[in-house]
Amino acid sequence: MTDLHTDVERYLRYLSVERQLSPITLLNYQRQLEAIINFASENGLQSWQQCDVTVVRNFAVRSRRKGLGAASLALRLSALRSFFDWLVSQNELKANPAKGVSAPKAPRHLPKNIDVDDMNRLLDIDINDPLAVRDRAMLEVMYGAGLRLSELVGLDIKHLDLESGEVWVMGKGSKERRLPIGRNAVAWIEHWLDLRDLFGSEDDALFLSKLGKRISARNVQKRFAEWGIKQGLNNHVHPHKLRHSFATHMLESSGDLRGVQELLGHANLSTTQIYTHLDFQHLASVYDAAHPRAKRGK
């Protein structure tokens, strides 16, 4: 039988040399495995052969009591299962003691969205230069069609059909979809196209950086965040919030879950159903504000 640390060091070398994992990933594995080493040592274990499912379960409970979140615990147990699988492959263990141990489900975090009043304030930016026109067009398209950030930066001029008010986008899994973008988005795209040649680009991209290249996702994130601050929005404005806001506002207005699924390009309806929880939050807030029986203490 071998020392606890020795086996972990051998495993980390395997991950580095044979699996060629990045230094950051290796460091994460090391941290997770050091946690189980400390727990095992505290409980008198001298080798991994002494580790059984009860030890792993107690380790999981201890991790939770120390404040480790459900998602982080799931990652820790995943690292532990991978390590024990490797020990089994090395004939150091007969079975993986972590195989039947799972973390509790992480609580569902509903996506943040921007309400209609704040969205109107965000879109009403001061147009004082060509880049501001570009940003207004990007904001209008993002909110008007519920695009993913990757879909927005991937748009080419050839993907536009401004006469019909539609764009073609390439979504996840190389799936194309044709989307309406609304009259405001069309108007601002046309305004931007009148100025686009100022950047002297031969690139086919619809939205360009100030250097005349296709705008990057990072640049879009930075510009949207800056506009959120300038327009006085309390919460950080991230491109994905515009997509969430599009979905929420569409569902509040139409109640058509299948239609929203198609517009968002979700393969599974279950992915779209999270917005029904947001819609319920909206209805609940309306109820609490308006219904006589909800007004406690009055």
From Swiss-Prot:
GO biological process annotation, one example: chromosome segregation
Summary of activators and inhibitors of this protein: FtsK may regulate the catalytic switch between XerC and XerD in the heterotetrameric complex during the two steps of the recombination process.
Active-site residue numbers: 148, 172, 240, 243, 266, 275
Alphabetized UniProt keyword annotations: Cell cycle, Cell division, Chromosome partition, Cytoplasm, DNA integration, DNA recombination, DNA-binding
InterPro entries, per database record: CB (IPR044068), DNA_brk_join_enz (IPR011010), Integrase-like_cat_sf (IPR013762), Integrase_catalytic (IPR002104), Integrase_recombinase_N (IPR010998), Integrase_SAM-like_N (IPR004107), Recomb_XerC (IPR011931), Tyrosine_recombinase_XerC/XerD (IPR023009)
Subunit structure: Forms a cyclic heterotetrameric complex composed of two molecules of XerC and two molecules of XerD, in which XerC interacts with XerD via its C-terminal region, XerD interacts with XerC via its C-terminal region and so on.
UniProt-listed HAMAP family: Recomb_XerC_XerD
Family of this protein: Belongs to the 'phage' integrase family. XerC subfamily.
Record-given protein name: Tyrosine recombinase XerC
Organism: Escherichia coli O139:H28 (strain E24377A / ETEC)
Gene: xerC
